[in-house]
Amino acid sequence: AVLKNEKVEYFDVVDIFDRVVGLAPREYIHANKLFHRAVHVFVFNNQGDIFLQKRSMNKDSAPGKWVSSCSGHVDSGEYYFDAAVRELGEEIGLHYSKDLNLAMIEQARPETGYEHVHLFVCNHDGELKLDICEVSDGIWIDLEKLDLWIEENPIDFAWSFVYLWKRFRR
């Protein structure tokens, strides 16, 4: 993840079939709507609630919006699973992968920000250590309450999260 005024990051550019076709800076990829890779992780507790994070106002996309438990781009040459493990550690302080499971794959499209997305799920009860540079807040929320919140106030959420959540809930 890149905050405003940080170094340039390069990601793999991929085709519609998720095959690597090049390498480009993050900003160029986003400006030109090139297909690239990302991961999202939904973390659930034993009560069945999901953890949501509120993005820092310093983020360059969707600042201050509620999103997945964690998410991020897949680095060049990195596997999706490894990116999910890395993002869990960086954003919310979970440094393990024992029950991290692939739940869904979404092909790159406008609704995903032109990202091929692998959505993972895992369970966790206990403390989370939020990275204050990336995350401004976090909550555990009941799934039905989240559905209602999204229905009543979709503006509170990153649009890509809303898309993925609705696909996940089908």
Residue map of PLM features:
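A glycine-rich, hydrophobic loop/mini-helix early in the fold
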Residues: 38-70
